Every structure is written in structure tokens, then in C-alpha cells.
């Protein structure tokens, strides 16, 4: 109902909602965990894209932690403290570890033959979309005032990519 929706929206506005995402990125960040505090704004030349904009951007903060490493890739948990458009994608790309298949921010498609260290083959990519997943959400229930949390399982395509990365470590 409207009052409940308003209370939840207010929590987002006040940054009281805790969100975490899982991303599969190229390479492994230098630090196991860190805070990225880089302001974001619309890209100066490409209107559909966002970029680090120190002088004119809005505050954007993301905490990340490397959960698992593989040959050439990592599974990273990201906890945005602000809610800017494309925030996680831009921040990870800025670290030089773009999200797999995120072509807008430097991520490449990954093919099974690459992971298996085999000869190039004509195959479909393991995942054809940005390997980013909204994993958990926590907020105060609008009527009971109890903290509630929700977890969404990995989509099949991301799980398949993780399975292959684990197999071909």
C-alpha cells in the first residue's frame, strides 16, 4: 500500500537500506577489500555512459571484497553506500577490473574454450550480459519495524560461469 511504499522509499533516500551485489570481474583487484570513493557523472562525450567526474560528479561510494579468485577472474561482493546509476560498473572499471561482458565499461565476453585453455572454437559466450547480480537487500519492515533481509540466488548464467571458473582454475 502507499504508506508502506513511502516508508521503504524513505529508507532508500536516507541510505538505510543495505544492498549487496555479486560481480564476476576480469583479473583480481590489488586489495582484498577496499572502499572506492569516486564521484560519478554523465560521461562528457557519451550521454548513455557514466564516468568518474571529480569536479562535477555526485558522491559515489562502494565497498568491495574479493570472495574468490580464479585464473584471470574474481568473484567480488560490492556494497554500494550511494545509489548512482552504473555506480558499481564504473567503480570496478576504474580499478581496471571491469565486469565480465560489460562492454560499455571495458568488460569482455568469455567463451568456454578460453577457460579450458583450448584452441579457439565457434561457441556462444558463457554469459552474454553483464555478470552483475543484485544479491541481498535489507531494510526495516514498514509495519513491524523489524529488520528484514532477502537473498536472491545467482541466475543460471552466472552460476554456470562460476562453475566453469572453478573447474578450470
Residue ranges: model-predicted function:
Residues 1-169:
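RNA pseudouridine synthases
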Amino acid at each position: 500500500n502507499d504508506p508502506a511504499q513511502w516508508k521503504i522509499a524513505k529508507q532508500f533516500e536516507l541510505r538505510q537500506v543495505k544492498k549487496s551485489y555479486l560481480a564476476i570481474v576480469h583479473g583480481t583487484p590489488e586489495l582484498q577489500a577496499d572502499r572506492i570513493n569516486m564521484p560519478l557523472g554523465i560521461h562528457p562525450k557519451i550521454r548513455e555512459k557514466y564516468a568518474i567526474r571529480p569536479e562535477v560528479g555526485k558522491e559515489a561510494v562502494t565497498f568491495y571484497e574479493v570472495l574468490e579468485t580464479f585464473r584471470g577472474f574474481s568473484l567480488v561482493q560490492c556494497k554500494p553506500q550511494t545509489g548512482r546509476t552504473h555506480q558499481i560498473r564504473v567503480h570496478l572499471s576504474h580499478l581496471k577490473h571491469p565486469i565480465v561482458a560489460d562492454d560499455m565499461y571495458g568488460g569482455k565476453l568469455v567463451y568456454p574454450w578460453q577457460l579450458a585453455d583450448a584452441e579457439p572454437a565457434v561457441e556462444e559466450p558463457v554469459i552474454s550480459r553483464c555478470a552483475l547480480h543484485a544479491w541481498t537487500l535489507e531494510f526495516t519492515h514498514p509495519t513491524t519495524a523489524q529488520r528484514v533481509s532477502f537473498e536472491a540466488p545467482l541466475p543460471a548464467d552466472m552460476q554456470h560461469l562460476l562453475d566453469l571458473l572453478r573447474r578450470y582454475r
